Amino acid sequence: TAYRRQRQMCIRDRNIPIQIAQIAKSNSIKSFFFVSSGYADPKNSSDYLKFKGLVEQEIKNQNFDKIGIMRPSFLLGNRKEKRIGEKFGIILFKFLTPILVGPLRKMRPIRAEIVAKAMVKLANENINQSIFESNEIAELVR
C-alpha cells in the first residue's frame, strides 16, 4: 500500500542516516558525509524535499567538525527497484542536459559513481563547503 511504502521510505531515508550519524558522533568520528536530494529544504512545498531538508538539519545538529551533504539531481546507475516516475525524469533530464546551463546546471543527472568519488575526495581534502548540488559534485571530481 502507499502508506506502507511511505513508512518504509521514512525508515530508510530518515532513521538510517540519523542513526548512523548518532553512532558516528558517539564514537568520536569527526566527519560525516551522506547523500540527500537536490532541492532538499525544510521549507519546500514538496513533502519529500521538505523531509530530506529536515534530515539534513538533524544531521547538521550533530555538530561534526566536517560534514558533506551531497544533493544530486537524478542519480544515474543500476538499481534493483523500479521507479517509473524517476525513470521518466531521468530520460527527460538526460535529453535536456545540454540546455541545463547557469543556475539550471544543478538539475543535471549525475552518476552514482561520481557522487561516491566526490565524497571520497571531500573526506581526504581540506574543502570548506558542506552542501554540494549536482553540478558542484561533478566539479569536485574533475
Where are these regions (language model features)?
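SDR active-site strand-loop-helix element
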Residues: 32-38, 70-72
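Oxidoreductase cofactor-interface core, primarily capturing Rossmann-like NAD(P)-dependent enzymes
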Residues: 42-141
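A short helix->loop->beta-strand "cap" motif at the edges of active sites that frequently abuts
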Residues: 27-31, 63-65
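Hydrophobic pocket-lining residues that define ligand/cofactor binding sites across diverse proteins
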Residues: 24
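Single conserved hydrophobic/aromatic residue that forms the stacking wall/gate
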Residues: 1-11
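Glycine-rich NAD(P)-binding loop of the Rossmann-fold in SDR/ketoreductase-type enzymes
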Residues: 12-16
